[in-house]
Amino acid sequence: MLPRAVAHISAAALDHNLSALAQRSGTRLLLPVKADAYGHGMELVGRLAAAHPDVWGLAVATPQEAETLARLDLGKPLLLLTPPAPEELGALADLGVRLPVSTLAEVEALPAHAQAHLKVDTGMNRLGARPADAVAVGRALAERGQLEGVYTHFATADEPDLSFALTQLVRFRSVLDALPPVLAHCANGGGVLSFGRIEGMSLARPGLAAYGYVPEHLRHVCALRPVMTVRARVNQLHTAYPGETVSYGALWRAERETGVAVVGMGYADGYPRNATGRAAVLIGGERRPVLGRICMDQMMVDVTGLDVGVGDWAELWGEGDLSVTDVARWGDTIEYEVLTGLGSRVERRVG
């Protein structure tokens, strides 16, 4: 069957971004591909990234993601970022997945053949050991020959005020200084762009930045490219006459004869319903408004005067004149939520 909506993943853009971020950080990359590679397709992106010389390994959030990637045998280290259930440890270790550890109890439960990365909570108050406790955990892992790396996560590195991120870095260094030399990583995308090379770090973990999206105040640092372009087909064309309304709630009313294209993308596909009244698409070479409420499976677009046919494509966001940042703003949300919310009915393909 023909896809009704497609997310085109640019291998060239991803390759460019990975090279630029590795150069900026001065390290190799541990690329997060969690949440279906931020909506881009975990297996697809995993294969592309594994072929890049600047990528040391891949990082995921759940044991299920880890198992899926490990079975692809991509030839790169794979780090699970969040603690698995105790009964999952053996299977993950058998697959070669690097495991996160932050307590002495987790050290004791770790299979003897597993490698671990010590997670340090330097201020995020999410996961990890506080610095005062982390050293003992790290030393216990090192004594067992299982400490491959140490990591933390910045809470504010993508903000203009970097004072708290610098405090976190000081706390992280206090742990590193008390442990034998191992892989160390702390910089997310904001950290890479804000700080550049951080002395003593072995890896960087740029998430959304690797896919081409960064806060506006950091865009001048690296010329990153959006990796994803989303397009959906025109399913039907008709005319709305003066006085007629379009979509649920009858919110939009035609003041003139209006060409209407029904485009196969809706909130069930991840397009934010909150963008109603503000959203637009690129179609027939122009930016045109979405009419009325966005529906579950489709949206209606004003194509008056355009040469558009059934089966033509409308661009929802991409590298051109309409970005996912626009869509997120219209939907009162953030790029992360739009991208990771992209539905399974949208086919991911390279090109």
Curated annotation (Swiss-Prot):
GO CC, alphabetical = cytosol
What this chain does, per the entry, is described as:
Catalyzes the interconversion of L-alanine and D-alanine. May also act on other amino acids.
Where, by residue number, does substrate bind? R126, M296
What chemistry does it catalyse, as a reaction equation?
Answer: L-alanine = D-alanine
Note whether Isomerase occurs among the keywords.
Answer: yes
Where in the sequence is N6-(pyridoxal phosphate)lysine found?
K34
Q: In which pathway does it act?
A: Amino-acid biosynthesis; D-alanine biosynthesis; D-alanine from L-alanine: step 1/1
Q: What is this protein called?
A: Alanine racemase
Record keyword Isomerase present: yes
A biological process term (GO) from this entry: D-alanine biosynthetic process
Task: Please tell me the species this chain comes from.
Answer: Deinococcus radiodurans (strain ATCC 13939 / DSM 20539 / JCM 16871 / CCUG 27074 / LMG 4051 / NBRC 15346 / NCIMB 9279 / VKM B-1422 / R1)
UniProt xrefs under InterPro entries: Ala_racemase (IPR000821), Ala_racemase/Decarboxylase_C (IPR009006), Ala_racemase_C (IPR011079), Ala_racemase_N (IPR001608), Ala_racemase_pyridoxalP-BS (IPR020622), PLP-binding_barrel (IPR029066)
Q: Which cofactor does it need?
A: pyridoxal 5'-phosphate
**What domain of life does the native source organism fall in?**
Bacteria
The EC code for this enzyme is 5.1.1.1
